[in-house]
Curated annotation (Swiss-Prot):
Signal peptide: none annotated. It holds the Pfam family TAF. Belongs to the TAF6 family. SMART domains: TAF. Functions as a component of the PCAF complex. The PCAF complex is capable of efficiently acetylating histones in a nucleosomal context. The PCAF complex could be considered as the human version of the yeast SAGA complex. With TAF5L, acts as an epigenetic regulator essential for somatic reprogramming. Regulates target genes through H3K9ac deposition and MYC recruitment which trigger MYC regulatory network to orchestrate gene expression programs to control embryonic stem cell state. Functions with MYC to activate target gene expression through RNA polymerase II pause release. It is found in: Nucleus. The modification Asymmetric dimethylarginine is found at residues 555, 561, 593. This is TAF6-like RNA polymerase II p300/CBP-associated factor-associated factor 65 kDa subunit 6L. The PCAF complex is composed of a number of TBP-associated factors (TAFS), such as TAF5, TAF5L, TAF6, TAF6L, TAF9, TAF10 and TAF12, PCAF, and also PCAF-associated factors (PAFs), such as TADA2L/ADA2, TADA3L/ADA3 and SPT3. Component of the STAGA transcription coactivator-HAT complex, at least composed of SUPT3H, GCN5L2, TAF5L, TAF6L, SUPT7L, TADA3L, TAD1L, TAF10, TAF12, TRRAP and TAF9.
């Protein structure tokens, strides 16, 4: 009796499971096939029992395919399609005789397409009710019309939506501030979120109006700052609208009087805020933003305003984004930017001004990269913290530059944020992580020169033994292949007594004629060292002075000579190029003598006038 009860259910043999697995390219052992056969039998019995319940609820005695599919859906399993026909499917055996498959009926597509009989609809018979009058009020909607999504909102939400949109896009700034503040704190506007996202996506239609673009970005910023909204499905749409304001050549950017640069800066900051607060809601958001910025930056056909947006966007995302995208592409991009900055034609004036904007944005981004790379490598060198150092000489720059750091790509904060970059932001496969801080600084110094605010050593580390006299340091790059910002240069010819102050009493006396032996026998303390004199050879060697000492130190008192080059302004012509040297007229004089006259350089709106004294000859405007 017990044996009959055990064999009451149908069991699937192991051979059937093994054949099904082999048909898909899998080989199963006997133990695995037995376990799978037992599990399949249990699942089939469960689905059959549930489908029989659906059959009994419909008061039928015949089990249909729809009942079985309902049982599968109830168990969160995909339904079986293709077996809902009322006719029985003919089954044909395979040649081996172990498998059966339904026979496929051949259909002639040509005859089916040219057939004149139109097949009837296979939809099920249903009854639809249309109420013409209810409570004495007529139904104005036509029969069969689909209700719109707006009709699902309440009257209060619709009224709120219209008032907020009118306040944001209106002319009253105080009302706009109140509306934006309410968008940041209101917890009952979740149903209106798709409509506000649609309003923000209208940036493409108002690209000619900077004021409207600013307001739409403020709406997006308010939505992201609202802690009660779930922005997961709408993050990509909002990011696309923000990227449009950052990267695209807006119609308002044609007029040079429109300040579209501020719009791009604000949109870049908003993009950074979106990434750090909602980047975990969308997979691959960081990679998508980086690819968009890299595509714009690598396109030479794009206008310079688009390149400016790409640079500020990378800077806003953090120094790792600058290291990964901007720094490897800088050598290629610099050639096109240099060609724009070297064009002095009148027709290129506006493009050149845009080029200077891009130059400044790149300079700020790479300086941020240098500072963060130094801070990332400093703790592993055992040096003091960056915040506790007050002077550049106290920082262990030489040990950072001349020795490779093992943690140049650690998880460090970006753009003032304490959050690390997600995995894949800057992985080990990035070639920029293998570049040391010294190599980065040398390459950037070859591009920007003294425009870099961060100062590191550009030479080799100080050896223990003295260098031979003929040993020369190779330059970082050829002077013709790089561009440096135009600046006032001063060539300082320093006497052997470089450690004495220029204003000392012995500046031109017999002490200055004593020769190099006197300066070597009586070294003075560091506080009395002149600015133009070299530093002491020691651990601090490698820090570059602004005015480097000449290799051939002449005899005599120190004197300064200023060289100014530029274009003289003219009213009826383009002006002429000039280069003028201004030596000191009366013996040695400090460089501070000309400091009060330097602001005259660059003023072209005022007429040039001569000074009362003849020795002040800095009167040529550039």
């Amino acid at each position: 009796m017990s044996e009959r009860e055990e064999r009451r259910f149908v069991e699937i043999p192991r051979e059937s499971v093994r054949l099904m697995a082999e048909s898909t390219g899998l080989e199963l052992s006997d133990e695995v096939a037995a376990l799978l056969a037992e599990d399949v039998c249990y699942r089939l019995r469960e689905a059959t029992q549930n489908s029989s319940q659906f059959m009994k609820h419909t008061k039928r005695r015949k089990l249909t395919v729809e009942d079985f599919n309902r049982a599968l859906r109830w168990s969160s399993v995909e339904a079986v399609c293709g077996y809902g026909s009322q006719e029985a499917l003919p089954m044909r055996p395979a040649r081996e005789g172990e498998l059966y498959f339904p026979e496929d009926r051949e259909v002639n597509l040509v005859e089916l397409a040219l057939a004149t009989n139109i097949p009837k609809g296979c939809a099920e018979t249903a009854v639809r009710v249309h109420v013409s009058y209810l409570d004495g009020k007529g139904n104005l909607a036509p029969q069969g019309s689909v209700p719109s999504a707006v009709s699902s909102l309440t009257d209060d939400l619709l009224k709120y939506y219209h008032q907020v949109t009118r306040a944001v896009l209106g002319d009253d700034p105080q009302l706009m501030k109140v509306a934006l503040q309410d968008l940041q704190t209101n917890s009952k506007i979740g149903a209106l979120l798709p409509y506000f996202v649609y309003v923000v996506s209208g940036v493409k239609s108002v690209s000619h109006d900077l004021e409207q673009l600013h307001r739409l970005l403020q709406v997006a910023r308010s939505l992201f700052r609202n802690p009660h909204l779930c922005l997961g499905p709408y993050v990509r749409c909002l990011v696309g609208s923000v990227l449009y304001c950052v990267l695209e050549p807006l119609a308002a950017s044609i007029n040079p009087l429109n300040d579209h640069w501020t719009l791009r800066d604000g949109a870049a900051l908003l993009l950074s805020h979106i990434f750090w607060t909602h980047g975990d809601l969308v997979s691959g958001l960081y990679q998508h933003i980086l690819l968009s910025l890299q595509k714009i930056l690598a396109d030479p056909v794009r206008p310079l305003c688009c390149h400016y947006g790409a640079v500020v966007g990378l800077h806003a995302l953090g120094w790792k984004a600058v290291e990964r995208v901007l720094y490897p592409h800088l050598s290629t991009y610099w050639t096109n930017l240099q060609a724009v900055l070297d064009d002095y034609s009148v027709s290129n004036a506006q493009v050149k001004a845009d080029g200077h904007k891009v130059y400044g944005a790149i300079l700020v981004a790479v300086e941020r990269l240098l500072k963060m790379k130094a801070q990332a490598a400093e703790p592993n060198r055992g040096g003091p913290g960056g915040r506790g150092c007050r002077r550049l000489d106290d920082l262990p720059w030489d040990s950072l530059l001349f020795q490779e750091s093992s943690s140049g790509g650690g998880a460090e904060p970006s753009f003032g944020s304490g959050l690390p970059l997600p995995p894949g932001g800057a992985g080990p496969e990035d070639p920029s992580l293998s570049v040391t801080l010294a190599d980065i600084y040398r390459e950037l110094y070859a591009f920007f020169g003294d425009s870099l605010a961060t100062r590191f050593g550009t030479g080799q580390p100080a050896p223990t033994a003295p260098r031979p006299p003929g040993d020369k340091k190779e330059p970082a790059a050829a002077p013709d292949s790089v561009r440096k910002m135009p600046q006032l240069t001063a060539s300082a010819i320093v006497s052997p007594h470089g450690d004495e102050s220029p204003r000392g009493s012995g500046g031109g006396g017999p002490a200055s004629a004593s020769g190099p032996a006197a300066s070597e026998s009586r070294p003075l303390p560091r506080v009395h060292r002149a600015r133009g004199a070299p530093r002491q050879q020691g651990p601090g060697t490698g820090t570059r002075d602004v005015f480097q000492k000449s290799r051939f130190a002449p005899r005599g008192a120190p004197h300064f000579r200023f060289i100014i080059a530029g274009r003289q302004a003219g009213r009826r012509c383009r002006g002429r190029l000039f280069q003028t040297a201004f030596p000191a007229p009366y013996g040695p004089s400090p460089a501070s003598r000309y400091v009060q006259k330097l602001p005259m350089i660059g003023r072209t709106s005022r007429p040039a006038r001569r000074w009362a004294l003849s020795d002040y000859s800095l009167y040529l405007p550039l």
